[in-house]
Amino acid sequence: MSEKIHIFDTTLRDGEQAPGSSLEVEEKIEIAKQLSKLNVDVIEAGFPVSSKAQYQAVESIADMVNGPTIAALARCIENDIEKAYQALKGAEKYRIHTFAGTSDIHIMGKFSDHKYGKDLNEKRNTIIKMAVDAVSFAKSFTGDVEFSPEDAGRTDINYLCEIIEAVISAGATVINIPDTTGYTMPEEFGEKIKSVKKKVKNINNAIISCL
């Protein structure tokens, strides 16, 4: 990938999680139009499966706002990905952004059921398969697929590199490396990004994003 910097704006999705923040669909459309005027590269418009209002907002922005790529969030679940596609399909350009928790804390909390594995290592392998399957499924709808290893800041670096390499091989074109809980110091997070770039063999086949 080239060294061009791409501006990814998530005001309408992650920004709305701020305490007291709640936007009507019409307000989201207006913000998206203003972001388009600013020439941002990607607008993450929402999480379509989470509510009817979220779906409507993403669908309306996809239909009405031209210029930027319109992105929608989806868990590593086929129904989420299908909903994202249905909301996005009217867009000039669109991206499906899928994610899975990868830190030990997230894995043992969100994937505690034995169906995901009897121990941490088995659960880690299950999550890699889920992520690969999700990226492959999303690729059937669009060539532009982003993957986020949620809570990357607290994720074991070797496991982080393993799952990133696997999803890039499956077709992910953007890898977001989020410090979801604000756990790491800036220097520490920078070292984590350096390690990913050094250890992931196919990292040059994807854009790295850090949110």
Predicted segments, located by residue:
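Histidine-centered divalent-metal-coordination microenvironment in nucleic-acid enzymes
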Residues: 211
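Short active-site-proximal "capping" loops at secondary-structure junctions
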Residues: 48-53, 75-78
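A glycine-rich helix N-cap at a beta->alpha junction
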Residues: 66-74
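Divalent metal-dependent hydrolysis catalytic cores, especially in the metallo-beta-lactamase
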Residues: 40-48, 71
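Alpha/beta enzyme core
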Residues: 2-7, 14-42, 55-64, 78-208
